[in-house]
Amino acid sequence: MGLLFAVPSFVWAMGSSLGAESTVSPSLMKLAHDRVTWFVAVLWVTGFLKLFGAALGIGLTRRRGRRIGRLMVFCGGGATVLLVWHGCLFVAHGVLVEAGALSAAPDLIGLTRWYLYLWGPWFIVGGLAFAAATTRYVRRQDARRELRLYGAVGALGALLLSLASAVTGIG
């Protein structure tokens, strides 16, 4: 699944809008269409981060060395928080728009529904999958207490990054 999740980022980074026109914000589509350098770079980096996430998910299926295990649990905790947070923001925004508590331009209502019913839940499920894989990995190790600490630090770091991003309006 992680590999499939990376495909759109690479497709869009190469200049195609396949699958994006009705599911992605028009402002982001414009940046991609205009080939804005920093945005194209973000698409490439995002694609590679998704590939890293796929490798991490696969890596969490087996015992690894002590250092690699710590790093994987740290990243697994961070990925859990980032994905669940991101998905919950999409869902919460969509629910508020659907309930009439927030307004959206009429041409964005359909897009809001994509984020509410597809993208938000997709991110949440991905985050929960990372949580399950990371928890399972930790439970099979001898140094559970130490690994839990690495996972907690990764999760806390991701939460702080997400909060800072939300407060500054960057993400």
Protein language model features and the residues they cover:
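N-terminal signal-anchor transmembrane alpha helix
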Residues: 1-13
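Perimembrane loop-to-helix junctions flanking transmembrane segments
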Residues: 21-36
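Interfacial non-cytosolic loop connecting adjacent transmembrane helices
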Residues: 24-28, 91-115
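Core segments of alpha-helical transmembrane spans in multipass integral membrane proteins
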Residues: 34-58, 77-81, 85
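Hydrophobic cores of alpha-helical transmembrane segments in multi-pass inner/ER membrane proteins
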Residues: 42-56, 117-133
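Cytoplasmic juxtamembrane regions at transmembrane-helix boundaries
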Residues: 56-79, 139-161
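Individual transmembrane alpha-helices with interfacial aromatic-anchor signatures
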Residues: 108-125, 146-153
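Juxtamembrane boundary at the C-terminal end of a transmembrane helix
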Residues: 160-171
